[in-house]
Amino acid sequence: YRAADKAAALGADALIVADTAVMAHCRREHPGLRLHLSVQASATTHAAIEFYRQRYGIQRAVLPRVLTVQQVAQVVRQSQVDIEVFGFGSLCVMVEGRCTLSSWVTGQSPNNAGVCSPPGAVRWSETPDGGVDAELGGMLIDHYEPTESRAYPTLCKGRFMVDGRRGYALESPTSLNTLALLPELIAMGVAAIKIEGRQRSAAYVEQVTRVWRQAIDRAAADPARFDVAPAEVAALARHAEGQQHTLGAYERPWR
């Protein structure tokens, strides 16, 4: 409550919320403050979003990264609130951040602490071969060779020995990138693109948002002729996990 009250006092434009008690408090104490339903509420249908609109007065909902483009379009058509979708950043194999793996290792809830890997639980150490070990909560989750770039250390994207082979046991580091879908997302009425930014640097924020701002402006001005520029792909690849991009559930190639 105190964080919400302070944000309102400072003149915040909106709050991103998942906790229903906080929503109820804000609607009662700060009726003029916009409430955006967090992705961690896991609202994937019009009915779920409508419940939050009627009960708590939300004005925008952030959709989880589990829907196809067609499903997103259906939610946009049926909803009476703005719809925001993820456009770039890390993917989550858990229920959008509510990760029991991270909680088990660090003793902190990512949902409440706001980070997958709390800084105090992360430890980097050089090894005799010139590489680097990455530990989370005292558990070794990866080893990087001297020539390898290091990724944001999360348990779900660590490399472990399984059946005598070392590799990614749960998920390979790959970033969501929906630049190619911009004309389609704009046409269906998506209100905003969300760029994942947990524990990212100021340089990441500046460079990634600059690329997306330019691409969105071009797509909005002339959607029929929009094409992703190679320079944009290269710029985002520098910030992509594993330097790989995917459309994720938006296209579901695994079906």
Q: For each predicted feature, which ranges?
A:
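Short, glycine/polar-rich helix-capping loops at beta-to-alpha or helix-loop-helix junctions
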Residues: 44-48
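A cross-taxonomic marker for long C-terminal extensions/tails that follow the last structured domain
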Residues: 55-58, 85
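Cys/His-rich Zn2+-binding cysteine-cluster or related metal-binding knuckle/ribbon modules and their
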Residues: 65
